[in-house]
Amino acid sequence: GSWSTSFGMSILLVRVPKELRKEDNVQDKTQQQIQELIGRMETVFATMGSVKAENGIVAWVLGRKDLMAFEIVVHKDKISFYVTISKKLRQFIEEQIHAQYPNAQIEDVSDYNIFAPTSVILGSYVVFKRADYFPIKTYRKLETDSMNSLTNALSKIDSGDGASIQYVLRAAHKHWRRDGLMIAKGMQQGKRLSDVERQGLLGLIWYVMRGLGAIITEHNKDKTPGGNTYHLSPLENDMIKGLEEKASKAGLEANIRVVVSAKTPEKAQRYLNDILNSYCQFNIYEYGNSLTKKMPMLQTRMIRHFIFRRFDESFSLILSAEEMASMFHLPLPSTETPKINWLLSRKALPPPNLPSEGILLGLSEYRGHKYEVRMKSGDRRRHMYVIGKSGVGKSVFQASMIKQDIEAGRGVCVIDPHGDLIDECLEYVPKERADDVILFDPADFERPLGL
């Protein structure tokens, strides 16, 4: 990514309601329900990974513009979920999220700032120990919500401090699958993993395409009574299955950054270690891949990349959609982690039979679309109550209706015990209607009102 791609981005706050059905409390159903809900986010990432990766001289010089950032942030004592996306891809991402999370609310917000003027800032990348094609453990193999450990670590951050887990993503080029499939194919032909890796890709392709595996195996069986074909262990068979499963999924190039801000160096180091240790649950130590921290020497460069959401090739890794969904998904209804920024009230789609004429009451915004809400004149003859506590906009709402009536030439009667609303309404009266105004002022002792 380049500096130019860091600007012109939309920062979206995504919130979901906490709704737990009674039947979801049954333990046998909970695990299945967890996997189904996390699977929704896998579908979102799979769609993103299926987009053709940008390439060519323009992408190389100016940087790829198909970057997306998914972030879990502790800011102002709340754990919030953000998506940062270019305006070009915004509608596409919103549609994908709403398709899987119909009750999610996505709203534009200004960028957050977890840093304080005197805070201590630490950051680290999370990278693979082995090649990208080796898989890690995903939510399908975990008994609990894979993100509970991450959000629990974030919930321990004190008020006034902050932290962010940032995933900067872009679609991976399709050739990333090739190496993993070649490794799996070589092991299926009776070779050890170490032998396949030592042989190298070119030799392996030649070996597979010429079908020499079967010839060599038969020759060795004739030569030696017991044969010398290597027999795979059950765990090695699982490894082959994992390699093939990862290669069958949509792939995303990722930078995983963890940045913390605290009042003291000791607290900052503790916060960082707690978050990084939460990634151990995804490790498959011997027959798969592991995640490890990689703290750059130039912390200022990393923090700058974090702020501008830049992609750094030197710390990249390739995750399948399933692996990415295991590390980032919207909070589940069963999540009990404190400080989650839940959606407390949902927005509903306006009814399709909204009147197209009448006085304008306001605008209803739903999933990026604005709808005019109007009231017909016949309905206004009924009693209407405007209820709400001080400061929520009752007088402003009434003043808007009064202004529309005055501008339309209709008659208006306003009784205001305070007088502020009357003063505001008088400003709406045009010169040509000045003679239409009758003002009853109880404070005018020269013209007392008879009650």
Question: Language model features by range: what are they?
Answer:
Residues 238-244, 368-372, 392, 397:
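Active-site-adjacent structural elements in folded domains
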